[in-house]
């Protein structure tokens, strides 16, 4: 048995076309959706992510603004810039690219973003709203994974789901969204005693720890859906995920590749969240 591939590029293309239509409709009414992206320092990976986000905006009819600062930028100056963007009616979404330099408190920075412009969904108000089942914004990566389940008619109600990873960006919100969809959810992490005992019972496994080959074929229930959120490099320097793809694809029912799986969906859902923010602002 070879797993069906969940193609993030193809789904992303469809959803981006829908986002572009919504952006065009808003622009025609004088409310072009706008996203501001702030980059502090010269982290090469962050620079690539920011470039991809700005390009996605340009390709789909969004207004975008990129603020790039040296890593000597003070926390006070960054907070002042966020305050300006909070008050700018052309900007509907504000994204601060993480990680930030050590002298800047990322929690303080995220909390400074107006919740209605927090398109990453990381603000404590949005995290709390997600917990109570009424999210204003769903964090982009878990939201993208949910769209993948939906597109492939993968049943979530009553399913046993294991999320490997407990980060605020992926693991925790992923678990909340699965819970909201009616799955029975287990969160595993670095302190979990017997990871395989949990994953072998799972209909759905989401791997999001940033550790190569944390999930191997012998740990997967036949026919399970395996979502790989990891982003690592193998010994040859080639991009790979958290899952041993070559082995697991012969056991799983559905699987996402790396690259070309969850990655493209993250930026797509950022566009969708920005559109939703712009639509709310237009009707306010």
Curated annotation (Swiss-Prot):
NADP(+) binds at residues 165-167, 190. Keywords: Amino-acid biosynthesis, Histidine biosynthesis, Hydrolase, Methionine biosynthesis, Multifunctional enzyme, NADP, One-carbon metabolism, Oxidoreductase, Purine biosynthesis. It catalyses: (6R)-5,10-methylene-5,6,7,8-tetrahydrofolate + NADP(+) = (6R)-5,10-methenyltetrahydrofolate + NADPH; (6R)-5,10-methenyltetrahydrofolate + H2O = (6R)-10-formyltetrahydrofolate + H(+). It holds the Pfam family THF_DHG_CYH. GO terms for cellular component: cytosol. GO terms for molecular function: methenyltetrahydrofolate cyclohydrolase activity; methylenetetrahydrofolate dehydrogenase (NADP+) activity. PROSITE patterns: THF_DHG_CYH_1, THF_DHG_CYH_2. Pathway: One-carbon metabolism; tetrahydrofolate interconversion. InterPro entries: Aminoacid_DH-like_N_sf, NAD(P)-bd_dom_sf, THF_DH/CycHdrlase, THF_DH/CycHdrlase_cat_dom, THF_DH/CycHdrlase_CS, THF_DH/CycHdrlase_NAD-bd_dom. It comes from the Bacteria. GO terms for biological process: L-histidine biosynthetic process; methionine biosynthetic process; purine nucleotide biosynthetic process; tetrahydrofolate interconversion. Gene3D superfamilies: Leucine Dehydrogenase, chain A, domain 1 (3.40.50.10860), NAD(P)-binding Rossmann-like Domain (3.40.50.720). Its EC number is 1.5.1.5, 3.5.4.9. Homodimer. Belongs to the tetrahydrofolate dehydrogenase/cyclohydrolase family. Catalyzes the oxidation of 5,10-methylenetetrahydrofolate to 5,10-methenyltetrahydrofolate and then the hydrolysis of 5,10-methenyltetrahydrofolate to 10-formyltetrahydrofolate. This is Bifunctional protein FolD.
